[in-house]
Amino acid sequence: KTDDMPTYNFANVVDDHLMGITHVVRGNEYLSSAPKYNLLYQAFGWEVPEYVHCAPVMKDKTHKLSKRNGDASFQDLMAKGYLPEAVINFIALLGWAPSGEYNEQEIFSLDEMIKIWDPARISKSPAIFDPLKLRAINAAYIRALPAEEFRRLADPFIDSAVHCSIDRDLLCANLQPRCEVLEDI
């Protein structure tokens, strides 16, 4: 902190311990803070979590992705009509690759990701955030939705775009195969 008090480090360790955090996955720019956290854990007599430090996610080859620089947050993506499951799937594949029978697969359920995730498969090189890849993954999730679920998710976007009486079931049946992001409506 700017007043040189380690309140953030202290609060972070206490919060993680109280939440039962066993693994901390974070950017490698935080590698130097791990010894401070470990000293706090040891001082309290608490078990130190496993740390996994990852290369940063990059906007391009020279700039880190950062919400301070106007890059989209999770909430921004939700407001644009990205599905949470698609964003999680996309982020899981940034700087990590599945192995074995899954190494060619790109679309995963959360249960599949939990089952096959291995920190040893995290790349040491920075990953570049590819918005077109995110759109493609989101499109696959949209197309896999049951029609009723697509309609429920699409309705607010239809409300803001269509101002006349229309058969929404027919509209949704035509939109779902073409829509990559709900904001496309």
What are these regions (language model features)?
Residues 5, 14-185:
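Conserved nucleotide- and phosphate/pyrophosphate-binding catalytic cores
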